[in-house]
């Protein structure tokens, strides 16, 4: 099966599942697509058990074996989804909430990594699961970032007020880049290989240099190429060519970031903010803005559907759920507690500077959905019994956050006086 065949099947399945959700379930698109895909996966497993020799499970395993989820998301879908999200974020609102967003995306991520890692290690030890503290901290790094893809789709549907939208979208856009950097550093220390591509455990100084190069380099590269793209857009008024320029900017910038060893997600977010704000105001005609918004909204919707379809099918990546279900379920409340701590501390520190919205901590805690980035990172680790426990735990947290938190966050927002129709 070639790449086109795989893509054709995925897009067709995403369209069918999206139709089923829109026609019958009427859930938010991300939650609905994931639910339909998950139920379909469970039906395949059930048929395979009830009808011996059906080979449906092996056929599904074979199809998923054609897809490298880590490569598909981290080196494919992610750059387009991040740029599409950043393109519609108000930079002025982001700057106004800058200190809070910075605290959530840095201190918050580090706190979450620590709480998840330590509590997971203790819990696994109590139930006889042999996983080291460093590996549990690595798990904390891959599960801590909130998913900007899921969160921003949610914000559009809920019509959240601008200040809250800037806080949630800003954190989720940046903490995935920080989380990936922390994950790679901890994976190197744990000598897990995979995404980190290591041969020996690095020193603290090497890790510091690595983190600074990834983050600062990503910001600088994103600003530099974002400015080049802005100047190119400003010099002409031809919307097909301008669409091509934005597409080329995203793809070349993301590829270049890997060649020069800086954070691709951070670089793409910075470029998206630049083009979506300064570029939108000063370099685009009304007609161009309309076409670019429509184009990137379509990209966002289509790739989101494919991503959450893949998430629903990745249940087959766990070889034996019976062996790992208990630890996976225990990790869910641990991650919720870690999210609460990682939000409460930066918010408490920011209250010294002035009053913040009532209920901000529970709102940010419950809206911190996890998604494809976490699954891609855990799948990048080498296969082992320990990796299967981490994979099942990651999947449990992602499914809980998208289906339970994603479908109930509207109630949380309404409880604190925000949501559709609020200002």
Regions found by a protein language model. Give the residues of each.
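Transmembrane helical cores of multi-pass secondary ion antiporters/exchangers
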Residues: 1-423
